[in-house]
């Protein structure tokens, strides 16, 4: 352990809160690890939310457990706290930090009509290039317009609009402060000047005073928490950064030569680097890690959640599934799967999208459907990878993270074959947590994340014949997408959905 002590890391996800301890060289302390699960509320109308107060109490319990597991000697040497959390969460709060609404998570799609209206009212490409975000239910503009319409009494109170960590920061330090990373995931931040976007605020009739203050860290815990956590009383808590950006930092994918492939509940493929893209590629997004580094990529709404749905719904025997999946030749199930059960983000951002399977027969087995679903998800990642090449060509490999993906050699090989690049296993199994620790250590000035080595395990190479088969299957999958989603939207007179057809052109 370096003499400099330790860094605590919180990882607040949409299904659990984790707390880990790292030394200031980003090495994980193996006997200190807290995992507290929770379940968001999900409903068929697009609801995807949780209770902010309950989640805050869970975060407090995670810190309690972290300090207990660390023990007196180690917890007294914690020099900073780093935080990774989900982008795009939105909660309304009063001046004292009391939540007035549920915490709306990224997958809540109830504002799809408002996102469509914003695309009619605004110049979608101009907004995309300014903010790095698309006009879609994922982001705050659509959710705020939806709340303005649906909650007029609340709206007239002019509440504060915060991400979850901004609310936590207010409770811990007395002020709602957000970092540019979390702000960049709202869809309201101008990426170039790192300030709130005036055009969007005027349209939504939201004042800057209703948004969190932009800052970097908090220090000096409020009395209640200073008594509860005396070892952290004067320790700096670095403002939370987006889990995706920190996953890149934590797996040492910090330049355009390496792309981070993450499959959690959802999925993402990202590039982290210093600078700004000349143009954000169509169908992708650009957020910030800090004022110097951006992360460009695409997020899939369907990743580990799709795999979980398949295995649960089809009642597959998991111990035998992996061996069966490995026996398939690429694209041999006879199925074409549009894997959009949780809607679509990148690259089409069709807020109304649903999943479909074509080619089912009486001979189709449960394993066939699972294999087709994994192949279809890999094809979606390949589509994102191709768009990244438009602005950041030359990636030599992908570094993969996510427990479900890393546990399945069959899925890893499918990824390598479909995307057409080597895919290496990341040895940083808790990449976002490690990224939070690195980010905090950078804040202390004791570590440079750019200089850390990428630790990888097995690398899966692309088989040329398999890649050719996936290229053909990509065309079939895009055609089914066009027929079922893009053309259906146009037939309904809803051309403003901004869905991309197979050619990648906007109609």
What kind of region is each of these model predictions?
Residues 187-291, 319, 323, 406-410, ...:
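ATP-dependent carbohydrate kinase catalytic cores
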Residues 12-14, 127-244, 307, 342, ...:
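Gly/Ser/Thr-rich active-site cleft segment
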Residues 33-75:
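N-terminal phosphate-binding loop and adjacent alpha-helix
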